């Protein structure tokens, strides 16, 4: 509920004020993705509270003394129950490519499997 409201506010900013700023001053964002896209991705991936905190940290880095550049949102954390089902790193065999650690599904060990290709399943919002 709160995440939906925050995403609607971000989208409203992107459609109105952000476009006005770009029209008057040109593109001024020092980061890629922009802070509003970063905030939307963080809220989708991490929820309203953690996503808002990550977005606030990003906004605090937006000043003339920071070099900016590519700064992607952090990957989502695993839920504790999902993390408990996964083998710990020291117990896992790094040569075992028959199981996907993210879903636990049995996979053929060919190059097009989602585990080998690095599929993250993330959805990002675009301006």
Swiss-Prot record:
Compartment list: Cell inner membrane
GO cellular component, one term: plasma membrane
Matches recorded under InterPro entries: Membr_insert_effic_factor_YidD (IPR002696)
Keyword annotations from UniProtKB, A to Z: Cell inner membrane, Cell membrane, Membrane
Pfam families: YidD
Lipid bilayer topology: Peripheral membrane protein
Bias kind Basic and acidic residues: ranges: 88-98
Region of interest: Disordered: 71-106
SMART domains the UniProt entry points to: Haemolytic
Recorded family membership: Belongs to the UPF0161 family.
Function: Could be involved in insertion of integral membrane proteins into the membrane.
Protein name per Swiss-Prot or TrEMBL: Putative membrane protein insertion efficiency factor
